[in-house]
Amino acid sequence: MTMNNFTTTMQDISTAFTIGSLEIKWYGIFITVGFVLAIILACVKLEKWYKISCNPFYWFVFIGIPVSLLGARIWSFIIGDASKSLATQNFFAAFFNFREGGLAIEGGVLLTVIAALIYFPLVLKKPQYNVKTKIGNEYYVKQVSMWVYADAIVPCILVGQIIGRWGNFFNQEVYGPIATEAELAWLKTLMPGVYNNMFITTTGNLHHPFFLYESFINFWFFLAIYIGGEFIKKRKAGDLAIAYFICYGLLRSCMEPFRYSDYQFATSIVMSVLFALFGIILLVCNHLVFSKHRDFKFWEFIIYKTKKFFKQDIKEFLDSKRNADNLKVQKQINKNITKEPNFYRKPSEIFYYNGY
């Protein structure tokens, strides 16, 4: 097919259908479908795999979706090209015109993570979300860690990104560098519909399907984290959530320079590198520090470290505080109170990963 053939067969594919004068864009449809599937898969992991309540996450959805859209839009105005629409529209009209694209994933993730760090520690303190675990012949009531929810929810963000990238295709945006027909012969054979629409009229050239490459790689990242990660024996609570930041940061760091020049933003590349570095540092800390101290309450830690000055007072104090919520904690402290080894509580999150 020659370039002239491309020109004569090209058509606007951004609109899925119309309701009266309202055009429903494919971009919005793919973003919505991505959100819905991500929510479903997160709930499946929580309810069926970890055996814990999905309700805290369910209610967070009503906070997380608008927050993520807001963060993605703000970030697109800061580091992307969404601000160009201000030349023809007022700020509010341009900012809330999601149908035309302009959502930067990093901004959505960052703002949603901040919201989650505030929301989940508060909500999970409610007794109705505690989990009863049987160890031997005894039952213990445990407060579910925020990290358990993070492991179930965060990797599912990749699902939204896998599907959402197809919105870029229908909008004919965020494409790769100029390509020859020979380079995309495989695409013409396997996905002729995509191939025929990779001739971008604004540049007058055939381009690599950047959206397809990133979507495909994210798909395998998702399978590796969501399913494969559950079979890693020595992992800690939080590792799967952290793996998302590492994988996505590395992918974007490698893929960003591959974008067509009009869609390359230096700030986006820097943020992608920071995402990956943040994930790597967090993973190291999670294994060396967080997993060992995560379950300590501050006062328990201080009391244990000063036990040699008033052992009996500590024992009486801990006995008086024993209840269903911290029974295992007290037994561990009482067991170790006359010993001097480094006293670390076994992370309670392991119960949920073992199917209790």
Swiss-Prot record:
The species this protein was found in: Malacoplasma penetrans (strain HF-2)
This protein's pathway: Protein modification; lipoprotein biosynthesis (diacylglyceryl transfer)
One Pfam family it belongs to: LGT
HAMAP family the record matches: Lgt
Binding site for a 1,2-diacyl-sn-glycero-3-phospho-(1'-sn-glycerol): 165
GO cellular component: plasma membrane
Sequence intervals crossing the membrane: 24-44, 59-79, 103-123, 144-164, 209-229, 265-285
Location of the protein in the cell: Cell membrane
Function per UniProt: Catalyzes the transfer of the diacylglyceryl group from phosphatidylglycerol to the sulfhydryl group of the N-terminal cysteine of a prolipoprotein, the first step in the formation of mature lipoproteins.
Family statement: Belongs to the Lgt family.
Root EC class: transferase
GO biological process: lipoprotein biosynthetic process
Keyword entries, A-Z: Cell membrane, Membrane, Transferase, Transmembrane, Transmembrane helix
Membrane topology: Multi-pass membrane protein
InterPro entries: Lgt
Protein's name according to its UniProt entry: Phosphatidylglycerol--prolipoprotein diacylglyceryl transferase
A Gene Ontology molecular function term of the record: phosphatidylglycerol-prolipoprotein diacylglyceryl transferase activity
EC number: 2.5.1.145
